[in-house]
């Protein structure tokens, strides 16, 4: 039985991967009167007088909403909200397993930006954080921006920022392995959607040299016509030498390639014209170039999104710890500095003496990562003055 059929059978057997468990046993009349009527009226009265008490008297202090509209689910595309539910449930299971953060999946049956924003805002008082998931670009940028302005809890689009954080962590260690200079790198990112643009911004904010964005038409340059707002924004801070051409042109002399695009777009010949290249080919399930081909082309370090190859670059290293840290100090938001510190925290999980071309990033199953990331995020929130406890 292949992995797809095995997963399908597991889902049929389980009828869902998550469930709600009561934290209070209700076995006596007294239990009932404390957990529900009449006793429950008192915490209601306290919250009505002081909104902040909702974080102390209910579970929202440790509860994240995992929300999609089903328009960009994995590599499946626009499959609708109901079909996105297995992914949202899986995400919730990972929150609990790796960070002991409770999470609840919500799938919104709308593609209208205003409707999605209003729906999420109206339910936000039930949660301590909002994890946006699998929402197509460019709509995802506006949805996140507006919700961050409206909500008083962290809003985090994991496809953007989770991916960016873990890629930066892997790149920090790959730079050490290859003895390159972080600030002098030429980095080519193929795929100018939600993940690619977020990776580009994050790497630039961290001081990773010159980032060149590419899409289906080739290199993106400031002043190009037909760019969406996200691409237009990053065009002003990337491709500092105003290069033009196709992906192969961008890769000449490049130190790193980061792919968040489509399978089999890169050849070993293209890798061979890089500068002792770092290759992160993260298209799933088939990467832009297979690791053996990249290595044959002269790549120094290769990472993918897959668990069956070394250096799996996976968001599960990010979102459990980021939210655990933010929730622990009641942070109002997840800032750029918090994201940068998260990248350094993940990178630190591999000591320098253990770094090799096949070992630049912690295993996604390493449950110590979430606590290290959480501490970095929480400490940064306190430092920036956005913690509320």
Spans of features found by a protein language model:
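N-terminal ligand-binding/catalytic initiation module
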Residues: 1-155, 380, 384, 388
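General beta-strand structural signal in soluble alpha/beta enzymes
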Residues: 105, 131-134, 155-158, 189, ...
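Glycine-rich phosphate/diphosphate-binding loop of Rossmann-like nucleotide-binding domains
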Residues: 74, 81-99, 157, 161, ...
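Adenosine-phosphate binding glycine-rich loop
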Residues: 158-159, 281-389
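Short, ordered loop/turn segments at secondary-structure junctions
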Residues: 69-71, 79, 108-109, 134-137, ...
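Solvent-exposed alpha-helices and their adjacent loops that cap or buttress functional pockets
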Residues: 12, 55-60, 96-97, 122-124, ...
């Amino acid at each position: 039985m292949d992995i797809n059929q095995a997963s399908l059978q597991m889902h049929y057997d389980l009828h869902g991967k998550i469930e709600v468990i009561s934290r209070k046993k209700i076995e006596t009349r007294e239990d009932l009167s404390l957990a529900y009527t009449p006793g429950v009226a008192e915490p209601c009265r306290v919250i009505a007088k002081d909104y902040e008490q909702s974080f102390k008297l209910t579970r929202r202090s440790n509860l994240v909403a995992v929300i999609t509209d089903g328009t960009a689910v994995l590599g499946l595309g626009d499959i609708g909200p109901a079909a996105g539910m297995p992914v949202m449930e899986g995400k919730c299971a990972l929150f609990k397993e790796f960070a002991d953060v409770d999470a609840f999946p919500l799938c919104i049956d709308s593609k209208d930006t205003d409707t999605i924003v209003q729906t999420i805002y109206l339910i936000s008082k039930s949660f301590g954080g909002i994890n946006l998931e699998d929402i197509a670009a460019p709509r995802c940028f506006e949805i996140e921006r507006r919700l961050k302005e409206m909500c008083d809890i962290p809003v985090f689009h994991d496809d953007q920022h989770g991916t960016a954080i873990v890629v930066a962590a892997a790149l920090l260690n790959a730079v050490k392995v290859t003895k390159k200079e972080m600030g002098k790198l030429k980095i080519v990112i193929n795929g100018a959607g939600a993940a690619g643009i977020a990776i580009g911004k994050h790497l630039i904010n961290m001081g990773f040299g010159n980032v060149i964005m590419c899409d289906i038409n080739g290199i993106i340059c400031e002043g190009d016509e037909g760019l969406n707002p996200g691409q237009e924004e990053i065009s002003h801070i990337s491709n500092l030498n105003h290069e033009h051409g196709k992906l192969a042109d961008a890769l000449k002399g490049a130190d790193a390639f980061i792919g968040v695009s489509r399978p089999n777009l890169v050849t070993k010949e293209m890798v061979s014209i890089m500068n002792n290249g770092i290759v992160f080919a993260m298209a799933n399930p088939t990467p832009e170039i297979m690791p053996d081909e990249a290595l044959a082309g002269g790549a120094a370090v290769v990472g993918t999104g897959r668990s069956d190859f070394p250096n799996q670059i996976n968001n599960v290293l990010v979102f459990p710890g980021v939210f655990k840290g933010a929730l622990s100090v009641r942070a109002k938001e997840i800032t750029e500095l918090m994201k940068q510190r998260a990248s350094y925290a993940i990178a630190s999980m591999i000591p320098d003496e253990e770094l090799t071309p096949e070992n630049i990033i912690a295993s996604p199953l390493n449950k110590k990562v979430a606590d290290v990331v959480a501490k970095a995020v929480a400490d940064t929130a306190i430092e920036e003055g956005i913690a509320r406890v």
